[in-house]
Each structure stands twice: as structure tokens, then as C-alpha cells.
Amino acid sequence: MKKFSISDIENLIGIKAHTIRAWEIRYNLVPPKRTPTNIRYYDEDDLKALLNIVALNENGYKISKIAGMSRERISNLVKQLKTDWNNDSVQMINLSNAAIAYDEESFSETLAGCIKEMGLTKTMDIVLFPFMKKVGMLWQTGAIDPSHEHFASNLIRDRLIVEIDKVKKPKRKDPKRFLLFLPEKEMHETGLLFARYLLKKCGHETLYLGSEIPYPDLKKVVESYSPDYGFIVLTSLNLGKDVNKVIGKVMDNLNVPLLVAGSLISEFDILVKDQLTPLKNVCDMVEFLEDL
């Protein structure tokens, strides 16, 4: 079973370490375990308990009252909140619990409930994109294993493909052609699949190439497919400082207007270029496509 330091827990549940220690001292709430050399740590059961405590606290329960409950009682109350699909904080905690436990059924149930209640676009905006950003940061810092990130990403990917297949593409007089791909060293397809979903809903044509497409291949594809736009999504933290260099390489080989989305676009200063349109969030994506 994985062991977590208090700084790991702080990052995972979004509560400061001194607050966690205050809960422990005042209420004996989820006291840490100790190694033979007296080093404090938390295990996966402790993490789940703390996530549930945060969920209740954010939904009106006082810590003093929660402290008097058993873990089973706390878990049952959180389960009652689970069907509050519009509550993004609860749903992110549900997804976190499921990912940590590799619980595919619970993860998929949460996804399905959110999408049914809010629709895919709102679910992506307020639940899934924030969740995946947090998971990516925790993976980079070692707070969770890469397998947790892959587990969550692949289930979201599978669900997006299902939602894309369900869309009945409307007929329009002037559909545009979009070339969707991820450049070299970018593997995360979630945002790109969501872009494909939006484009299909708007009645546009897409050629979806997936991840890590070599730069030289782009010229050949453009010559064959003749897209009106290229579309990439940049989220990998290891590309951060080189984000403008990556965009430049893509544009040099693409030679058509380029749309760029992803978390890196909102976190770094993107150089202004002709034929480049940064899309910083879901609202930007939707508005751009609606205006075409």
C-alpha cells in the first residue's frame, strides 16, 4: 500500500498541512501512522477518509461534528452526496477516490452521472479538465503513481469516444476541415478528443491523427487532406518552457491557420502570430466554433 507524507496529503486534498495537524491535535481526526524510525505517514485508507471529510466539510458539515462520526458513517454520507451531479467539488472527490482505488465501476458511474445531468461540455469544463490538471501535477510531483493517471485518462478517453459516436453531425452548407493532432512529446488526448466532439456537433469535418505526430509528416498530410485549420492541444508540463517553440515548429510544417488549446496556453505567455488562435478555456473553444 502506498505511503503519503503530509505534504502529499496537502496536495491531494487541497487542505494546508497545519490545518490537517490541527484536526489531528484537536479532534484526533485521521492520526498518521509512524514508521519504526518514527516518521509520520498516511496510507490509502487515510487518504480516502480525508477526501471524504473534505467533501462533507465543503457541504456544510462542521469538522467538530465530523470528528464524532465513524469512517463508515462519513463514507455513507458522502455516498448520499454522490448523486448531486452538479456539485463539482463532490464529483472531483468521487473521481479521486475511484482513481486511487482503481475502481473502474465507480469512476465510470461518476462520469456517466455528470454527463447525463450536465452534458459533456459542462462536465469537461468544471469537473474533468480541473481533475486531470490536478492529477497531472500530482503525478509529476510523485504524490500519486503514473498508473493512477493512466487509469483515469484511459477511462475518460473511452467515454469521450462513446460520446463522439453518439453525436449526429448536423448538415451545414460550408463545413470546415480540421486536422486534429498532438505534436511530438505530447501524449494526452483528452482535450483533442473533446475538440473532435465539439467539431462534430457543429457539423465540421475532422481528420484525427492522435498523439506524437512527427513534424515532417504534417506537410504530407496537409497536401493530401487540405485542411482549413490545424488544431493541437498542449498539456504536458515538460513542454511548458518550450511551448512557443513547439507552436512555431507546428506552424512551420503546417502552413494553415492553427488553433491551440490546453492548460499550457493559459499558464504561459503565447507569442502573437498571424494565423495563430490560442483558445484558453472551454468557453473560448465553444465561442470560436459557434462564430465560424
Please identify what each model-predicted range represents.
Residues 9, 16-19, 211-214:
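Short glycine/proline-centered loop/turn elements that form peptide/ligand docking sites
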Residues 1-10:
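A short, Lys/Arg-rich alpha-helix, primarily the initiator
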Residues 143-145, 151-292:
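C-terminal regulatory/effector modules of DNA-binding transcriptional regulators
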Residues 4-5, 18, 51, 194, ...:
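Short Gly/charged-rich anion-binding patches and loops
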Residues 6, 20, 247:
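Generic structural marker for isolated residues within well-ordered, non-membrane alpha-helices
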Residues 1, 14-15, 47, 190, ...:
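Residue-level recognition of alpha-helix initiation/capping sites
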Residues 12, 16-168:
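Long amphipathic alpha-helical segments
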